[in-house]
Amino acid sequence: CCGRNTTILSEMSGYSDRFFFYTMDETDIITSRHLQKIPRAIREICESSEKEPSVVMVCMTCVDALLGTDMEHVCRKAANEVGLPVVPCYMYALTREGRKPPMVAVRQAVYSLLKSRKRRGDAVNLLGYFSPLQDDCELYDLLKQAGVKHIREISRCGDFDEYLAMSEANFNLVLHPESRLAAQDMEERLQIPSIELTRMYDTEKIHKQYGIFSKVMGASLDDRPYKEEAQATVEEFLKKYGPIRVAIGEMMNGDAFDMAAALSKYGLDVREIYGTVTAESFVRLRQLAETNGSIKVYSNLSPTMLYYADDETVDLAIGKDAAYYHPKAAHVFWNQEIQPFGHRGVTTLFREMTRAMEGHSI
């Protein structure tokens, strides 16, 4: 599964020439002889590449987790062999339900090469996603209002030197929970503190969060124009289509339960949610129970979804999973690489919803 997905995604994105696979057999697993070959393989790859890489990342799967492989030692040996940084990355699906699931481990590994530098008071890092926020996101403007001149995201770094400059940040802004551990690691190693902002789709909650952030920053941040624009887009949609029936899935850019609570508050009729219920989800579920207790919640992980019957009339499905369950509804996949955030995220969402209702599949 890991190899298949990596191959497909790397080919689609045009960087398949940067990925290499070591095929293990039973003898490798029993004798661990593959560990001796990894440093040599890395050297051969670096020597055969047209352009020498800046860093090499060695990704391990569950096999090495079960073997108890000391991949830190293997990577140190490889680094000495090629004279380049070699970083281990643990892609262990076995840890998915634990404290350090794969995507948390990957984020920590990605920032592990940053070294201590003199910090700049006008620099900040945005941690959370492997792709950038939408260009018109108000967060960039609000940070500039606070005097920030250098806003860095790993996905916008043009080269390795720009990546290393992330060590100069005065603080990190954590935009996704899976980056908390990476931020904690950077605070311990580089003394860069962090502030967390949550992606939400309720304009009032977004405004309140920015208000708290404004106090922490000690600056006056004005998000009102963006809030008013988002609210106007919501009102325009409701005026045109009314309280349509909506199904919301988890395969999209957002939390299904947060989005359901926000859309219900706006006046839409949320009928179904497809998502994994966590401790954080119950906060939104309690809100939904008070306003719309008839919402059905399904788990995509449950085998019983094989028997799911599309007997609920839905006008609009948000998320690729919800679209699968409701093929006749208007669809907004909302899983684009560029990440929506804040008021502009709400504005963009409702514009996409409008386009979908007009007959276009987004």
Feature map (PLM): residue ranges:
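An N-terminal assembly and electron-transfer interface module characteristic of large anaerobic redox
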Residues: C1-I362
